[in-house]
A protein has these predicted regions:
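Acidic helix N-cap motif at the loop->helix transition within catalytic regions
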Residues: 16, 41-50, 72
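Short aromatic/hydrophobic "clamp" motif used to bind/position activated sugar donors
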Residues: 86
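Short hydrophobic beta-strand elements that form part
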Residues: 3-6, 33-34, 63
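Short, well-formed alpha-helical segments that are part of the catalytic scaffolds
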Residues: 11-24
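A conserved acidic beta->alpha catalytic loop
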Residues: 36-45, 66
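Short helix-capping segments at alpha-helix termini
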Residues: 26-28, 52-58
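Glycine-rich, basic loop-to-helix element that forms the pyrophosphate-binding segment
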Residues: 64-81
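Cell-envelope/extracellular polymer assembly enzymes that use nucleotide-activated donors
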Residues: 1-3, 21, 31
């Protein structure tokens, strides 16, 4: 099983392209775990729309209650993955 961990924070301009890149890989991933670190832009809305339009892949979105910073947020995302390969 292959998992992708994403740590997001105010990534609205790039998140759609990042998700498309993961989705269009030759070897499909089994899950995408996204942890948003209290974005103040529309990052979460874009991700939620992506999840609704891509039901053939397991995408889970988690939203932090407080900003953890990049390292802790990415560590959290990795810890939520179920794959043998991350």
């Amino acid at each position: 099983m292959i998992s992708v961990a994403m740590a997001t924070f105010n990534g609205e301009p790039y998140i759609q392209e990042q998700l498309d890149s993961i989705y269009n890989q030759t070897r499909k991933v089994d899950e995408i775990i996204i942890v948003d670190d209290c974005s103040t832009d529309s990052t979460v809305r874009v991700i939620e729309q992506y999840i609704l339009s891509h039901k053939d892949i397991d995408i889970k979105l988690y939203k932090n209650e407080e900003n953890l910073g990049y390292k802790k947020n990415f560590k959290k995302a990795i810890s939520l993955c179920h794959g043998d390969y991350v």
